Amino acid sequence: MASPRVFPLSCVVQQYAWGKVGSKSEVACLLASSDPLAQISEDKPYAELWMGTHPRGDAKILDNRISQKTLGQWIAENPDCLGSKVKNTFNGKLPFLFKVLSVDTALSIQAHPNKELAEKLHLQAPEHYPDANHKPEMAIALTSFQGLCGFRPVEEIVTFMKKVPEFQLLIGDDATAQLKESVGGDTEAMASALRNCFSHLMKSEKKVVVEQLNLLVKRISQQVFDGNNMEDIYGKLLLQLHQQHPGDIGCFAIYFLNLLTLKPGEAMFLDANVPHAYLKGDCVECMACSDNTVRAGLTPKFIDVPTLCEMLNYTPSPSNNRLFAPAQSQDDPYLSIYDPPVPDFTVMKMEVPSSVTEYKVSTLDSASILLMVQGTVTAIIPSAHAEIPLYRGGVLFIAANESVLLKITVPKDLLIFRACCLL
């Protein structure tokens, strides 16, 4: 009998310190709903759910008819399951890693190298850059989700320099003057001035950074205590970041980078060399299968300042330009498609109302991973004459060209995300 080509997965949870704790975490709630044996500790963080074949989180196969223990092992022995184009383009490997993140405290400000730079960095310093792949990524909000993303318009940065003297002091008079002069000029002049300012900030002496940050925190705290609103300089966020990462250069990055608050279903796409940081909330994330990160702050980890300042994309743009809108499917009223300008991954969102009794998952020429965020269904697999019950938090691997029919077993709306590779 042929090996099943659609099967449920048990996925790896990462308990990084920045994750939401216990049942406040969407990751923990998905885990608890899908696995009756899961024990959720109310004092432990549940930061990420990894759905894929990454060596640090290869999903286990929940089908005793399959001899391989993990998805990575199974794909290695059944590479045709990827679909012919995906198999040939990505050397028989699943090209994406699919995740759920539950963020309580800010992650480091970071950027990911493009493929060319990733190869160079990996050769030079494999201890810091573990592979030669690029790492574009996309976050889709499940709850209100706050993040920093890309350089804000230069006019806004100049305004912060006027209002936050501690910030301007670290950048210095010459770099500040160059940035002010670039306003309204050509894009290249603005990007060059921005690079100069950001490099000055990142290369500031630690002692001076700590002094200026303490002065700013003291000033904002006093104003807030006196009943003044300090939101024109993001007072609340600065105090929050300083509490999480005292004395960290990254606290000043909020004056350089766009602050986005995504509503559920809204997305941001983070291409190579775009500085970003996730601050708070729950999201679905999809990325190319890589671990390469160049950090810029809000972290005790290694910061490669020269590489960072050299590689970043310094093109400023307003925050609403950073939102990535999905396309509505022409054939399926319940399907939205988030298809970023990279070959490695696409994410589909299915919102099916409770009035529908069954829903056909579209057949693709790509392996895919499906996550049940809301709802209870029975997945019917015609090719295997099999039925698989799926609850909230359930994860299903679907090989290329397999059809799946979802029968809704509890009359509640469905929210499903599916990662795939549409070449």
Curated annotation (Swiss-Prot):
The modification Phosphoserine is found at S102, S108. The keyword Oxidoreductase does not apply. It holds the Pfam family PMI_typeI_C. Its cofactor is Zn(2+). GO terms for molecular function: mannose-6-phosphate isomerase activity; zinc ion binding. Binds 1 zinc ion per subunit. The modification N-acetylalanine is found at A2. Zn(2+) binds at Q110, H112, E137, H276. Pathway: Nucleotide-sugar biosynthesis; GDP-alpha-D-mannose biosynthesis; alpha-D-mannose 1-phosphate from D-fructose 6-phosphate: step 1/2. The active site is at R295. It is found in: Cytoplasm. GO terms for biological process: GDP-D-mannose biosynthetic process from fructose-6-phosphate; GDP-mannose biosynthetic process; glycolytic process from mannose through fructose-6-phosphate; mannose to fructose-6-phosphate catabolic process. It catalyses: D-mannose 6-phosphate = D-fructose 6-phosphate. GO terms for cellular component: cytosol. The keyword Acetylation applies. Its EC number is 5.3.1.8. NCBIfam families: manA. Isomerase that catalyzes the interconversion of fructose-6-P and mannose-6-P and has a critical role in the supply of D-mannose derivatives required for many eukaryotic glycosylation reactions. This is Mannose-6-phosphate isomerase. It comes from Mus musculus. The gene is Mpi.
